[in-house]
Design a protein with these regions (language model features):
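Non-catalytic accessory segments flanking enzymatic or RNA/DNA-binding domains
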Residues: 1-276
Length: 276
């Protein structure tokens, strides 16, 4: 086999080329296209080193997908409110890094519906679409609300999760394409059932803070998958440094081999070598 790249891995870059997603490994400063590798035998080799994506310190364990422990405990991007945006404490003056919070949290966010392993509600910065949907493996997606801050979008998501899921079932995601659904109809049903809660949030934060997104059609997304596995088996590079097999496809941040699946994003900051 020939080495085609090595370096600190981060989540694969993903872009739409028509309806189909094009992927590339990001190994340090180098990108290696992945779609052309489908059908080939590929080997990923963990080289035994992890370097924090923020400070570069070598660490035995990756925290919060790519950070050392000291950075995980002090960086705003590793705080609990990243996973639970409704717990944002920027307004309380206790943000770990107010400048970071201004840039990433106190900015427009989009609340969306996506169909990955089924319908889910999610939030992301307005600048992160459609990348967020591609990373999640969504086959359909529809933005439904534009919200002024991350915390406020978290309140909306919390309201909607009583009606729809807010998580993706990764095993179902990798077993096949989700059945198509009518996202506009689901949106309308959500707005109707949660009307009182939405009105309360608009009264609290202002009408301009939470606005519906109208006249937008759902996006349809296709993933480069030749064959889905009958049984889901995950590679674990911490236990076995080699993941090898015939690459059958890519979906979300997962590589699908005939021998197992691997979530590339999980191994952010790991030093890897890729062989073909």
């Amino acid at each position: 086999m020939i080495e085609i790249g090595r370096g600190a891995i981060s989540k694969m870059s993903a872009r739409l080329d028509g309806p189909t997603v094009q992927y590339a490994f990001r190994l340090g400063d180098v990108e290696v296209p992945v779609n052309p590798l489908i059908g080939s035998t590929i080997r990923l080799e963990y080289l035994g080193a992890i370097h924090c994506t923020h400070c570069g310190r070598r660490t035995k364990t990756s925290f919060s997908q790519g950070y050392c422990y000291p950075c995980m405990t002090k960086l705003a991007q590793c705080d609990l409110c990243i996973m639970s945006p409704e717990r944002c404490h920027f307004d309380a003056g206790t943000c770990r890094d107010p400048a970071w919070g201004e840039q990433f949290c106190m900015t427009d966010h989009v609340v969306y519906l996506a169909n990955s392993s089924g319908v889910k509600v999610g939030i992301t910065r307005a600048t992160q679409l459609p990348t967020r949907w591609l990373d999640q493996g969504a086959s359909q997606a529809l933005p439904i609300l534009r919200v002024a801050t991350r915390q406020q979008s978290g309140f909306v998501e919390d309201l909607f999760r009583s009606q729809v899921a807010d998580k993706t079932n990764w095993r179902a995601l990798l077993k096949g394409d989700a059945a198509a659904v009518d996202l506009p109809a689901i949106r309308d049903s959500l707005f109707e059932s949660c009307a009182q809660g939405l009105q309360g949030l608009q009264e609290r934060f202002g009408l301009q803070a939470i606005q519906t997104i109208a006249d937008v059609e759902p996006i349809e997304i296709r993933y480069p998958v030749q064959q889905y596995p009958a049984k889901i088996v995950s590679f674990n590079l911490d236990k076995d440094p080699i993941a090898e097999g015939t690459l059958l496809g890519i979906k979300g941040q997962y590589l699908i081999f005939d021998t197992g699946v691997i979530n590339i994003r999980k191994y952010t900051a790991y030093q890897l070598a890729v062989h073909q």
